[in-house]
């Protein structure tokens, strides 16, 4: 369903691949599936990682980014996840989207051409400016500087 928050993203297919373009699985999905464009199977042994080509390059509009995230089913069933999650595709990047996958499971996993390997979420970007101060007293909070489990586990 189209609404006023939809944006148009330019995409090119690389190497004459016949893979589908990234797409939403359901009407309310946040992420679009990305596919492996590797022409040879990639064997991921436990603890190993690989950079997987997707066969596409995109032009993200200024003010947005594309985030590459794991697919929950691959993570739960096989321990396959995106290593640098979320992977960031900046608006000025024009190269092929590649996904670094790691096998955190106990069994070898094979990635084949056309497998759904990750999902991509388009998100707005806000650029911050810094205000250098001597202390953060104006921002006193209940939590303060307590971290790493201080609010419970």
From Swiss-Prot:
Q: What class of enzyme is it?
A: hydrolase
Q: Where does substrate bind?
A: 71-73, 84, 88-90, 98
GO terms (BP aspect): dUMP biosynthetic process; dUTP catabolic process
Top-level taxon: Bacteria
**EC number(s) per entry:** 3.6.1.23
What is the reaction catalyzed? dUTP + H2O = dUMP + diphosphate + H(+)
Q: Which InterPro entries match?
A: dUTPase, dUTPase-like, dUTPase-like_sf, dUTPase_trimeric
Mind listing the GO molecular function terms for this protein? dUTP diphosphatase activity; magnesium ion binding
Listed pathway(s): Pyrimidine metabolism; dUMP biosynthesis; dUMP from dCTP (dUTP route): step 2/2
Name the cofactor(s) required for activity, per the record. Answer: Mg(2+)
Q: According to its UniProt record, which protein family does this protein belong to?
A: Belongs to the dUTPase family.
Job description of the protein? This enzyme is involved in nucleotide metabolism: it produces dUMP, the immediate precursor of thymidine nucleotides and it decreases the intracellular concentration of dUTP so that uracil cannot be incorporated into DNA.
This protein is called Deoxyuridine 5'-triphosphate nucleotidohydrolase
